[in-house]
Amino acid sequence: MDKKQLEESVNNRRTFAIISHPDAGKTTITEQLLLFGGVVRKAGTVKAKKSGNFAKSDWMEIEKKRGISVTSSVMQFDYAGKRVNILDTPGHEDFSEDTYRTLMAVDSAVMVIDSAKGIEPQTKKLFQVCRMRGIPIFTFINKLDRDGREPLDLTAELEDVLGIESYAMNWPIGMGKGLKGLYDIYNHRIELYRSEDEGQAFLELDDNGEIKGDNPLKDESIYKQVLEEIELIEGAGSEFDEEKIAKGELTPVFFGSALTNFGVKTFLDAYLKYAPKPAAHKTEDGSEVEPDRKDFSGFIFKIQANMNPNHRDRIAFVRICSGEFDRGMDVFLERTGKKLRLSNSTQFMADTRETLETAVAGDIIGLYDTGNFQIGDSIYTGKKAVKFEKLPQFTPELFMRVTAKNVMKQKSFHKGIQQLVQEGAVQLYQSYSTGDYILGAVGQLQFEVFQFRMANEYNSEVVMTPMGHKIARWIDPEQLDEKMSSSRNLLVKDRAGMPLFLFENEFAERWFMDKYPDVKLTAKL
């Protein structure tokens, strides 16, 4: 396509992540958005296991069994003239590294908050990452169908705890069993609360904010309270400011109930209107790659094994940063300088997919990987090499020895470990002295998921033995003496063969540094 066609296609892309604390309803709202995109006919809720209706975005076996998201899912659909790329992220803190990497691949974020709980720890952490990147944040306060905290308390907490201005796009008229509707401040109307199969019902407002014609809410005391609250926030709150939204300084706030699909369409319509088109991406040398640049470029932010367990495949997820992708094109892999032909490409609906012929900047595509790619790799066309900035990597704080339960199944054991480690959910180390495999993780749940997937996907039961070590520190190979190792500071090597010590605690680390004052230890490579 020519430059003008490329620019138009790129401008129609909207790529965002949904972030929240566990159980705020993130996966449920994702399902409802897919309904509007015509991708699914019925939203499966996480709770509906007996009926077999699992959330479309929770595709992994362990997610279906436990009702949690443990991996980022990618879903695409067309709606109102836009191509929407949604990345549904794990809410559980043990999988925050996967979520952080995902946030590097999006142009905006939707923050889902439970109306009964307000801002929770994981929400705050993920918000801060978005803030650091300066990406726009849209807020959906969920679960209006249940009793929750006062709306004024929730918006005040949003501003106080997160330090961001907010603008209420709508305001709840009641909550729980007393929910009557939403006062749509921005669209100047009232959206009545109806059951999902009844569809939307609106009452238009006149210039004074009064309902035109018959007012079914005139005798409701809650409605009078809502009018007073709206007068208060319009007088004392922030004004709607598109420029501040684009800079991530102001968050538009929407109320609704994802479970009953109430207020979700209103949110989606407004989001697509004000969310940013694909932005430029920074490279490691500090320059930026514009999305309408003719040459193709992108980076791999995720690798997922066994999305189709029948084929034991691996998919590398790519955020396209510039230009146009065509199936069968040749690209350079920046890390090796090697030229690769991208003949097997796919687009996603969580675990289902279809062959992808073309895509443009802003899109998320999948490449079948035979072992060429690593998380953080840059790929590009053209004469000038492109290397995008590094993706975040967490230093593990928990460690376990892992061995095969059945020594006769060493082949599947090794294959499983290598593939799952390449996804980046756990880190792999090997003892210098014994060659034992040691796994490192940020949280306990990562180990549980690893153990489950080894048995479920590779038919390899494993024995996990907890270790008392808590701190990982790398050492320059030239300064290394294997005699430095002891039970309290265990010498291991990472996947790249670089040496590091695992310390039991800060005291053990200080003791080591006092004994070897000239040795330089680093927390990350």
Swiss-Prot record:
CDD domains: RF3 (cd04169), RF3_II (cd03689), RF3_III (cd16259). It is found in: Cytoplasm. Pfam families: EF-G_D2 (PF22042), GTP_EFTU (PF00009), RF3_C (PF16658). Coiled coil: none annotated. It comes from the Bacteria. GTP binds at residues 20-27, 88-92, 142-145. GO terms for molecular function: GTP binding; GTPase activity; translation release factor activity, codon nonspecific; translation release factor activity, codon specific. Transmembrane segments: none annotated. NCBIfam families: prfC (TIGR00503), PRK00741.1 (NF001964), small_GTP (TIGR00231). Increases the formation of ribosomal termination complexes and stimulates activities of RF-1 and RF-2. It binds guanine nucleotides and has strong preference for UGA stop codons. It may interact directly with the ribosome. The stimulation of RF-1 and RF-2 is significantly reduced by GTP and GDP, but not by GMP. Belongs to the TRAFAC class translation factor GTPase superfamily. Classic translation factor GTPase family. PrfC subfamily. This is Peptide chain release factor 3. It comes from Ligilactobacillus salivarius (strain UCC118).
